[in-house]
Amino acid sequence: MDTIENNVYEITSCFAIRIVHLYKYLTEVRHEYIMSKQLFRSGTNIGANTFEGKNAQSRADFCNKMIIALKEATESGFWLDLLHKTDYLTEEQYTSLYDDWNKIMGVLTKIVKATKQ
C-alpha cells in the first residue's frame, strides 16, 4: 500500500478522535447539540470510510470509499465553519481543527485523483 494511503488512515483516525472530544465538549460544556451531532457524524465517518477502504474488493471500491470520505470531510468543513461563526468554537480551536481538516482534504483529493487514473 502506498505511503499516502497509509497516512490517510492515521490522520483521519486522529481527526475522528479530536471530533469525539470536541463533541463531548460542545454538548457537556457549551450545551450545543444539533450542529455538534452533525459534525460528530460526518467527522467520524471520514475515518470509517478510509478504514473500510483498506479492505476494498477492487480499485473501484477503494476509490468509492475515498470519494465518500471526501464528501464527509467536505461536510465536516461546513459544520466547523458554522460552529466557529456562531461562536461555539474559539479562533484557536477552529484554526487547529481547520488545519487538520485541510490536510485531510488535500490527502483525500490526491488519493481520489490518483485512483481514478
Language-model segment annotations:
Residues 1-48, 52-117:
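Short, C-terminally biased terminal segments at protein or domain edges
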